Amino acid sequence: MKTGKTLRAFIIATFSLYAIPLFAQKTPSLSDPEIASVALTANQVDVAYAKIAQEKSKDPNILEFAKTMTKDHEGVIAQAEALAQRLSLTPKDNAVSKQLNNDAEETKKTLNAKTDKDFDRAYIDNEVTYHKSVIATVEGVLIPQSKDAELKQFLQQVLPVLKTHLDHATMIQSQLPK
């Protein structure tokens, strides 16, 4: 019974990540401070997932991937914060960033409830889903709605990193037992 509830919660959390781009597209307009908040939040969320993986996984591929996620996303956060400071732009919470945080809390609970190979599978499945969703949101919402040229350029420069993460996660996913 508990496994069924946990799986259901994970599926709901994963599905809700796919809803983020759809939800964001229904947002009439995101200001640059709101876009900055979404970008920062998305990176902070993935760092949180990676830290859970670094604590729980024993799989060398998962551990290396999680270490890369932490390093890369913390680097993006530092760059985003520096850009925001340079542009005198204060990130502003909004429905999309709040939804990201709410979904992340559920996903973290689900990940923390898993162990061993079940954890590894849940983590990497989430990473694939999460990166697909974030890429779709950056391409379909954040870049088109960015007014500031530097912010738009920053988001465009982050996309290849996100796509590399997705490719890496997909490769690891294909190597894990079903």
Please give the residue ranges for each predicted region.
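His/Met- and acidic-residue-enriched segments that coordinate or traffic transition-metal cofactors
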Residues: 2-9, 18-178
